[in-house]
Amino acid sequence: EKQTSLQNFTGVKIGDVKPGIIDLEGCSYVTRETVVGLDRFRLSRGDLLVGMTGYVGETGLVPSVEPAAYLNQRVGRMATESGVADLGYLYCAARSPAFKEFAEAQSHGSAQANVSGASLMAFPAVIAPLSLMERFNGAIADVLEVVLTNHEQAQTLSTLRDTLLPRLISGQLRLPETENLVKALIF
C-alpha cells in the first residue's frame, strides 16, 4: 500500500538500493501492525545495504528516516556495533568495483540474478591490524558523516521547497521583502 502517512513505515526494497545512498523517496510503506515483532529488520542510520537480487552487489548507506525504515526481502544489511564510527573499512570494501564484480560472479538465476548472503560473506579481503583499522575507520567516519549529513540536509531543503514554492506561487505565502518590492514598483 503506497501511503505517506506518518503512521506508516518505509519498506526498503531491492530497487531502492542505489549506489551511495539509499533512495527513500520511492519506497513503499507498511503499516504499524505489519512491523510488530520485526525489530531485527529495523534499519539504522549508517547501515550499509546490498542488493541481492536484480541489482546484485549495489550498495548504499541508509540516511536518517522518520518514521523508521524496515528491510525487505532480498536486500542484505551490513552493519557494525558502533554504526558509522567503525564502518569505514567495510564501506570502502563493499563500495569497491571488485565487490560488485565478485557479487555478480557469485550470482545465479536465468531470469534474474540472485546472490546469497553466504556468497557475499566469502568476498576475499585483506584485514589490517586492529590499530590500523581503527585509525582508518576514524578517518573515514568523518567523511561518511559529512556524506550522510549533506544528503539529509538536501532532503530537508527539497521537502521545504516542495512545500513552500506552490504556496508562494499561488499567493498563499507572502514574503515581506517581496511585498515591499512590489509596493515600491507599483507606487
Question: What role is predicted for each listed range?
Answer:
Residues 1-13, 127:
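Extended boundary segments
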Residues 40-41, 50, 140, 147:
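His/acidic/aromatic-lined binding-pocket segments of jelly-roll/cupin-type domains
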